[in-house]
A protein has these predicted regions:
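Secreted/periplasmic serine-hydrolase-like ester/acetyl group-modifying domain
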Residues: 113-206
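Short, flexible loop segments at the rims of nucleotide/cofactor-binding pockets, characterized by
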Residues: 18-24, 45-46, 72-76
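Short extracytoplasmic
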Residues: 34-58
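A short, hydrophobic C-terminal helix/tail in secreted or cell-surface proteins
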Residues: 207-211
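Membrane-embedded segments
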Residues: 49-130
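Mature, folded catalytic cores of secreted/periplasmic enzymes
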Residues: 61, 95, 200-202, 212
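Alpha-helical transmembrane signal-anchor/signal-peptide segments
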Residues: 19-35
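Hydrophobic membrane-insertion alpha-helices, especially the h-region
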Residues: 1-17
């Protein structure tokens, strides 16, 4: 008797969670990894700097290197760490590349960005740890473990896409690379601004001992 309500809740959750198939595709990328072959030479972690600029197809065609990008929008450095731990359960790549620019961000920006990284992870101790480190004050752990708690009111926003992809969403990337029509190769590099003068805080201001 208990199983019937549980099944109904599960079906409802599958229907109500966002599918990210045609809009905000970044939200589908983390989950896609689990359907890929687990034999990559290189694993790449980070945000749009990696998943819009590094092409696993080009790496394979030109150098014979198999790679996968576990990228997501505004991916934080600790999220990259737990994604790495999660990935190492499935394979052992020879090289791991991490976008260290994320180290400049100390706090999560919003629930929306958190969701695009965390919702797609399979439930594990690494997902729970990443949730704990990422949550804003308004968020709670239960809504990540049971997404229905977060998306139960989304019924009024449902579209045909939610029904079509209730069980399986189409791939939006190629090995984690998200093709964006608006992204173009750099043709000119603007002149960099002059660096600030850090003389006052450098070692040159120290009074060094002199030989008497």
């Amino acid at each position: 008797v208990i199983k019937i309500p549980m099944v109904c809740l599960y079906l409802l959750q599958c229907l109500l969670v966002p599918k990210y198939a045609s809009d905000i595709k970044e939200g589908a990328m983390i989950k896609e990894y689990y359907n890929s072959e687990k034999n990559h030479d290189v694993l790449i972690l980070g945000d749009c700097e990696v998943y819009e600029n590094i092409s696993p197809v080009t790496m394979w065609e030109n150098y014979g290197i198999s790679s996968y990008i576990r990228g997501s929008a505004e991916q934080l450095i600790w999220q990259s760490y737990y994604l790495l731990e999660d990935t190492l359960k499935y394979e052992k790549p020879q090289v791991v590349i991490v976008n260290v620019l994320a180290m400049t961000q100390r706090d999560a920006k919003s629930e929306a960005y958190n969701r695009m990284t965390l919702d797609g992870m399979k439930l594990s101790k690494y997902k729970i740890a990443s949730i704990r480190e990422s949550m804003t004050e308004e968020e709670n752990m239960a809504s990540y473990i049971f997404p229905l708690l977060r998306y139960h009111s989304r019924w009024s926003e449902l579209s045909s896409e939610d029904f079509r992809y209730m069980w399986k969403t189409p791939s939006v990337t190629t090995n984690g690379y998200l093709m964006q029509k608006g992204v173009r190769p750099v043709k000119t590099i603007p002149k960099a601004a002059p660096l600030a003068n850090y003389t006052s805080v450098s070692y040159t201001h120290l009074t060094l001992p002199t030989n008497s």
